[in-house]
Swiss-Prot record:
Large subunit of the glutamine-dependent carbamoyl phosphate synthetase (CPSase). CPSase catalyzes the formation of carbamoyl phosphate from the ammonia moiety of glutamine, carbonate, and phosphate donated by ATP, constituting the first step of 2 biosynthetic pathways, one leading to arginine and/or urea and the other to pyrimidine nucleotides. ATP 1 binds at R129, R169, G175, G176, E208, L210, E215, G241, V242, H243, Q285, E299. Mg(2+) 3 binds at Q828, E840. This is Carbamoyl phosphate synthase large chain. Coiled coil: none annotated. The gene is carB. Mn(2+) 2 binds at E299, N301.
């Protein structure tokens, strides 16, 4: 039966900011759903608080709301837009929870809105652990032995029945938030307490331990006529006990017998039928006991998920697009498969003739205090996917695509003495981010497959595959390049070995190895992802490399532009860069170029098969990019949009004759190299903070004294402020030097005088090489010293004098012309005591480009891509800066809740995973909405409220204004001695509270007794930061709002004065008033 005609308009709820457990895969699914439904003639209304998404581009929906995803804000949107239906299955857990809230508060009933894609009963049955357990019993399937607890007493009762270890999982959370494995009473108490706080219905499921069992996922799609297909069966390389988002996963499943697969297939279909998912995609997770073969259903997600994005990219079957069409009444047999050009219907189960491996990307280096062991709570921030003809090939491609400095199964332990072996065994028994490397090391040390299976519970089949790779490496290390025959070289490349790894094993330079390989005629061929194992022809150029005979690339002779993507998400390089790559591809396609995308991140829109004309799902490494460039012969390659990943390759690509368009690699180097940059700043007569470069510890101490403390120290060439710190004296610098010089890669350490209490500004600009147009000026809310990616910022600036802004515009334009920028450029400036200082210049895409584009209503990335391809700003009609008539605030979102031991203080090292945007007529309104969108607690506006203040000496004067504002808002004040004395001298009423080391009762006791509603706590110096970290960690755990900068505290006071009225505005209407 074709689509429904009784609904005309549909509200899609997005997933909000990127957080651990919920990343850009929901931008990919949401963007697909928007396209699919508009294709069918429906009016699409979208709400999503994340400006860095493609789905919030104003062209993707008829009405776009970048607003907080709370049921109260969405109610306002429903009231204004009157949709007929709401589709909550495209925005992850955020959208499901919001839809359930709308249902619970009677909003859907009040406005006559139908929930499509999944109904409230099905969502509740899948999400409510008790109901799900009962449902499985009804269809004769087993769940892990488990019971639901609503209180600590019930939890202890259940634990006594199940024993230890037990697995704890809260209801209605994603990414395993608040869950964990408890081996003893102390851990049990801690995990349950945290779990109860995070579950929105105060409910925990306590399971028997399935640690060491095999884990599988089935991606299933079902329509209303009960047609069901399995899109993909995914097997976890890591056994149960590691969250599936943190596991290495492989598709199709490798170690199931056909009978086991059919049983699991039947079971997953039965689960969907029982839960009542009638229209769309779901994923069902199974555990299998390797000893007895017992199968249990672990859980199911009645929505598009992280693994469905992976399954879509792995098979070419667009689950989100199909699910959206099923939600409006189509059946699978009525929909055709795009990849085969409609030659097959969507009811054909995909079959694949290759192996896909996904490996998660972790950023534990950002959180040294965090527990880096992998458990049932997800900790990875991104992932990489690779496709090969064999498991070995796809695994090795994925390992080099991770960009963690590994070219393959690189050794982590070099000496197999007692200490080395103890370290290896520890890493094998309790999984960390690099366990697979330690498995290889254990094999090098002589452990057998059987011993490794006992230590890790990783299936023997995978271990045998790894053993073969390790053995091959050991044999190779005894030989020289000159004695290898072409046949042997070909066999090595078929196993997925990278040129760099083979060169390392053979003791030659990578480029010499590559020359020898190519001279022997050993080159990759490109195969197509076609959903049907080459049974039908495919018109879609979605490709991966392999070492085989026949190439399916079918290269055209059209002029081509190649865009290099950013690889896996990580803190410091996320969805914002993918957004820029997508926009570059769209602009170039519109201008008549054939567009080629190279990337290996399965979550993103850039790796959707219809974003570009040709997609190469390949690691973004020199070897892989050179081979594609040689095959395609593009007219130009864009390396400036994907963050550091492609930029790192720029020089070598250029040297190999690859045509890089836009700002030259030399100009990029001029901006990034300290000494060359200094020359440029001096030449233009601009100012920089006093700075120096040190190549040894002694030199660092001498130069730090000369430029004066406090100083910011960092290694050269970093993104996201890796290993960047503020040091306040020589002992802190010494401490830093012992840790940081390791990451310096023989490159020096940079020292800058730190501009205390300066206002920091970010400016994005576009240049065509002659003319420069400012994209937007953003004023940071936190003072200098907080990484620009972590600071909230406002556009237009809310307190920066107009003449200062004009001078900044002038400086940016002069620098762009001097550097010969062609494309995007981002400049960070600071204003202190009437002087403007240049902090840094990046002649490339920055993470603020999507936010600025949403504010001004013009895609800066598209304008810049056209400049790079030789179309001037005048020809594009983009000749003057657009200053919006409304305020927008970008707020960062942090993963601290996933890492309970980490101090949530902001520093020059970037820690945020995502961002939200709030807009309003005033700065206060925009800031308030950004806080709501970020899920930040905002102090209550009524009742008895106490604010606790404890600030560093330089802030003692400034805190008086904050205290006055808080008193005016009805707060009572308490403060530590020094701060209290400053407030008392200003005549303000305040109670004195002990610092933690001054005796009880102290500040943390107050917090734990729920006696504090708001905290302002600023510190400087390593000792003071350590002393006060318990205050911030306790505030975070107890959801008490806090500010760690005075500027942040002032902004919160303004937001509180604004009140809590919720207004919603359509992005298209906002933009109508800002056109040039």
């Amino acid at each position: 039966m074709p689509k429904r005609t009784d609904i005309q308009s549909i509200l899609i709820i997005g997933a909000g900011p990127i957080v651990i457990g919920q990343a850009c895969e929901f931008d990919y699914s949401g963007a697909q759903a928007c396209k699919a439904l508009r294709e069918e003639g429906f009016r699409v209304i979208l709400v999503n608080s994340n400006p860095a998404t493609i789905m919030t581009d104003p062209v993707m929906a008829d009405a776009t709301y970048i607003e907080p995803i709370t049921w109260q804000a969405v109610e306002k949107i429903i009231e204004a837009e009157r949709p007929d239906a709401v589709l909550p299955t495209m925005g992850g857990q955020t959208a499901l929870n919001c839809a359930l809230d709308l249902d619970k508060h009677g909003v859907l009933e009040k406005f006559g809105v139908e929930m499509i894609g999944a109904n409230a009963d099905a969502i509740n049955m899948a999400e409510d652990r008790d109901l799900f357990d009962q449902a499985m019993k009804r269809i004769g399937l087993e769940c892990p032995k488990a019971k639901v607890a609503h209180s600590m007493d019930e939890a202890w009762q259940i634990q006594s029945e199940l024993g230890f270890p037990v697995i704890i999982r809260p209801s209605y959370t994603m990414g395993g938030s608040g869950g964990g494995v408890a081996y003893n009473k102390e851990e049990f108490e801690e995990i349950c307490t945290r779990g109860f706080e995070l579950s929105n219905n105060h409910e925990l499921l306590i399971d028997e331990s399935l640690l060491g069992w095999k884990e599988y996922e089935m991606e299933v799609v079902r329509d209303k006529n009960d047609n069901c297909i399995i899109v993909c069966a995914i097997e976890n390389f890591d056994p149960m006990g590691v969250h599936t988002g943190d596991s290495i996963t492989v598709a199709p499943a490798q170690t199931l017998t056909d009978k086991e697969y059919q049983n699991m297939r039947d079971a997953s279909l039965a689960v969907l039928r029982e839960i009542g998912v009638e229209t769309g995609g779901s994923n069902v997770q199974f555990g299998v006991d390797p000893d007895t073969g017992r199968v249990v259903v672990i859980e199911m997600n009645p929505r598009v998920s992280r693994s469905s994005a992976l399954a879509s990219k792995a098979t070419g079957f667009p689950i989100a697009k199909i699910a959206a069409k099923l939600a409006v009444g189509y059946t699978l047999d009525e929909l055709s498969n795009d990849i085969t050009g409609g030659r097959t219907p969507a009811s054909f189960e995909p079959s694949i003739d290759y192996v896909v491996t996904k490996i998660p990307r972790f950023t534990f280096e950002k959180f040294p205090q965090a527990n880096d062991r992998l458990t049932t709570q997800m900790k990875s921030v991104g992932e990489v996917m690779a496709i090969g003809r064999t498991f070995q090939e796809s695994l090795q491609k994925a390992l080099r695509g991770l960009e963690t400095g590994n070219d393959g199964l690189d050794p982590k332990v070099t000496r197999f003495n007692d200490d080395g072996m103890a370290h290896i065994k520890g890493e094998l028994q309790v999984a960390g981010a690099e366990r697979i490397f330690y498995v290889a090391d254990a094999m090098r040390a002589g452990l057998s497959v059987e011993e490794l299976f006992r230590l890790t519970n990783i299936d023997r089949w995978f271990l045998v595959q790894l053993e073969d790779l390790v053995r091959t490496e050991a044999e190779l290390a005894k030989r020289s390049l000159s004695e290898l025959t072409p046949r042997e070289l070909f066999a090595l490349k078929r196993k997925g070995f990278s040129d760099a790894r083979l060169a390392g094993l053979l003791g030659v330079a990578e480029k010499d190895f590559r020359r020898t390989r190519q001279a022997a005629g050993i080159r990759p061929v490109y195969k197509r992802v076609d959903t049907c194992a080459a049974e039908f022809a495919t018109d879609t150029a979605y490709m991966y490399s392999s070492y085989e005979e026949e190439c399916e690339a079918e290269v055209s002779d059209r002029p081509k532009i190649m865009v290099l993507g950013g690889g896996p998400n990580r803190i410091g390089q996320g969805i914002e860069f993918d957004y820029c790559c997508v926009h570059a591809a769209l602009a170039m396609r519109d201008d008549g170029y054939e567009t080629i995308m190279v990337n290996c991140n399965p979550e993103t829109v850039s790796t959707d098969y219809d974003t570009s004309d040709r997609l190469y799902f390949e690691p973004v490494t020199l070897e892989d990019v050179l081979e594609i460039a040689d095959k395609e012969k593009p007219a130009g390659v864009i390396v400036q949009f994907g963050g550091q990943t492609p930029l790192k390759l720029a020089r070598e690509l250029e040297a190999a004759g690859v045509p890089i368009i836009g700002t030259t690699p030399d100009a990029i180097d001029r901006a990034e190299d300290r000494e060359r940059f200094q020359h440029m700043v001096d030449k233009l007569g601009l100012k920089q903070p006093a700075n120096a470069t040190a190549r040894s510890x002694e030199e660092a101490f001498a130069k730090a004294e000369a430029i004066g403390y406090p100083x910011v120290v960092r290694p050269s060439y970093v993104l996201g402020g890796x290993a960047m710190e503020i040091v306040y004296d020589a002992s802190e610098l010494e401490n830093y030097m012992t840790h940081a010089v390791k990451v310096s890669n023989d490159s020096p350490v940079l020292l800058d005088h730190f501009l205390n209490c300066a206002i920091e500004v970010d400016i994005d600009a576009v240049s065509d090489g002659h003319q420069v147009v400012i994209g937007g000026i953003m004023q940071h809310i936190e003072q200098a010293g907080v990484h620009s990616g972590d600071s909230a910022c406002a556009l237009p600036p809310y307190s920066l004098p107009a003449e200062v802004q004009d001078e900044m515009r002038d400086q940016v334009k002069r620098m762009a012309v001097e550097l010969g920028v062609k494309g995007l450029m981002n400049v960070q400036l600071a204003w202190q005591d009437g002087e403007i200082y240049v902090i840094e210049v990046n002649p490339r895409a920055s993470r603020t480009v999507p936010f600025v584009s949403k504010c001004v209503g013009t895609s800066l990335a598209q304008v810049a891509a056209r400049c790079m391809a030789g179309i001037s700003l005048a020809e594009q009609g983009f000749v003057e800066e657009i200053v919006p008539h409304f305020y927008s605030v970008k707020e960062a979102v942090f993963p601290f809740a996933k890492f309970p031991g980490v101090d949530p203080i902001l520093s020059p090292e970037m820690k945020s995973t995502g961002e939200v945007m709030g807009s309003g007529d005033t700065f206060a309104e925009a800031f308030y909405k950004a806080q709501l969108g970020a899920g930040e607690a905002i102090p209550a506006l009524e009742g008895e409220r106490k604010a606790f203040l404890s600030v560093r000496d330089p802030d003692k004067q400034g805190v008086i204004d904050v205290a006055r504002s808080l008193l005016g808002l009805g707060f009572t004040l308490c403060a530590t001695r020094g701060t209290a004395s400053a407030l008392q001298q200003a005549g303000l009423p305040v109670d004195v509270v002990n610092k933690v080391y001054e005796g009880r009762p102290h500040x943390v006791d107050l917090l734990k007794n729920d006696x504090v509603a708001y905290i302002v706590n600023t510190t400087e110096g390593r000792q003071a930061i350590n002393d006060s970290s318990v205050i911030r960690r306790t505030a975070l755990a107890r959801k008490v709002p806090y500010a760690t900068t005075l500027a942040g505290a002032n902004a919160v006071c303004l937001a509180l004065e604004y009140g809590n009225a919720i207004t919603v505005r359509r992005l298209q209407e906002l933009h109508a008033g800002v056109s040039q």
